[in-house]
């Protein structure tokens, strides 16, 4: 199983998850290019990417690009750990039953 962690900022939840489950936490996504979670991921050797909604003409296009990234990483499960965006219909359709919000 490959897990992606979504985070919008610091990434302390991601770091705990990655340290506890290093064999399955394989990818980090952030909706901010300057989020510290990306630096944490780099330090732990976890693949990562970021996209910002303002770079796209619509949320649908944003989520389509995100789905492409996740599919390329062969992600099975998504953990929302401090992710501050609302997940839209494109993501929900593709990952139905495979998204867990961690608070």
What is each residue range found by the language model?
Residues 1-102:
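One-carbon transfer enzymes
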